[in-house]
Amino acid sequence: MRAVLFDVDGVVLDSMTIYQRVWAQWCMLVELDPATVWPLTHGRRPQDTIALVAPHLAIDSEMRRLEAFLDKESSPLPAMPGAHELLAALPPRQWALVTSNSETFLRSEFALLGLPWPSVIVDGSSVQEGKPSPQGFLAASARLGCAAAECLVVEDAAAGVEAGLAAGMTVLAIDPPPGGPGLATAHARFPSLEAASGAIRDWILADHSAAKVP
């Protein structure tokens, strides 16, 4: 059986502008440079970013600050073009979400948007190590009953691409112009989820011997 493992932020949800604003507010509060911190957040769990850039601060209290800033933003976060159609077209037991975000938060966002919800989600609190560790992707494939080699990872961050490759999976990167750092090692790159939809559907529908990501 083949499966697709989706990152969420920047892939399914168009959330990066809002998250950049949230991190900028947090950086101002703790006197860090937003331009330095923001690139380090891509693909990482928030708690891992805090530990990396502010090891002197208590992670739990800083997470609450980030959540408070996020709560002030409008909800729901917008879905990426083509996300609903793609997820609705995939067999429910053949796709999962692997995200640094919170399952509780995403359940609410997906419900508000009317997006299909998967049978398997591995969120940031479900694993000991976040991306670029492959733990999340391997956990998702195991829960789906699918071998790692039969999984297609859809990512937009270098840490996620690294995690997917380390898991032994095929990796498709969502890489809008002018192109992001660290995505060149993916097996394929597309400018948007909508542009990648055909290749993702082919991965699920095609025979193992014939299927490939261009």
Question: Can you name each region flagged by the protein language model?
Answer:
Residues 1-91, 102-103, 107, 115:
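N-terminal helical cap/lid subdomain that shapes the substrate entry/recognition surface
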Residues 1-2, 94, 102-214:
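Asp-based, Mg2+/Mn2+-dependent phosphohydrolase catalytic module
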Residues 9, 36-39, 52, 73, ...:
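Short, flexible active-site loop motifs that bind/organize anionic cofactors or intermediates
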Residues 14-15, 41, 97-98, 155, ...:
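Small/polar loops that bind or transfer phosphate-bearing groups
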Residues 79, 98, 129:
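Residue-level marker of regulatory loop/turn positions in helix-turn-helix DNA-binding domains and
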